[in-house]
Amino acid sequence: MFRSIVVGTDGSETATKAVRQATELARAVGARIELVSAYEPVSDARLREESIQVPADLQWMINPRDDVQAMLESAARGIRAAGVEVEVFALQGDPADAILDVAEERGSDLIVIGNKGMTGAKRFLLGSVPNKVSHHAPCSVLIIRTV
């Protein structure tokens, strides 16, 4: 049935619900999970050009890859604890494009994503990622009602 399930997450509470449900499904059918998140760093040049002072609690936005990778690894530990094989992908760029690219590259049979997503930086417009993914996916899409 399903061998490879791509799961998009931004680390939010709603995305975590989708990850949990995808993990249960993967365990039930013996599939592996490809866990995907995307980030878009703010360039130092742009910060200097616009004289932007970044508060300490938002420094992750300048080079968020490490934080995204840490969030993915934390989620992956929970998936592995459930007995499911998982690989993580922290990709720079648009979240929907990252999910679609991984699904295509890995030959995935299913994409699981929450119906709403939001981060502290509000880089996910509510509903825009699942909408784009559902319209352009190379495989079936399961949209989890998370709110």
Region annotations inferred by a language model:
Residues 123, 138, 146:
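Short, conserved catalytic or interaction motifs in soluble domains
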Residues 3-56, 82-84:
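Small/aliphatic-rich secondary-structure junction motif
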Residues 110-135:
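Glycine-rich, Arg-bearing micro-motifs that act as flexible, cationic patches
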Residues 37, 115-116, 146:
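Short secondary-structure boundary segments
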Residues 54-70:
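A short acidic, glycine-rich active-site loop
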Residues 1, 14, 51, 74-111:
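Structural beta-alpha unit
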Residues 34, 87, 142:
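Conserved beta-strand positions in the Rossmann-like core of class I SAM-dependent methyltransferases
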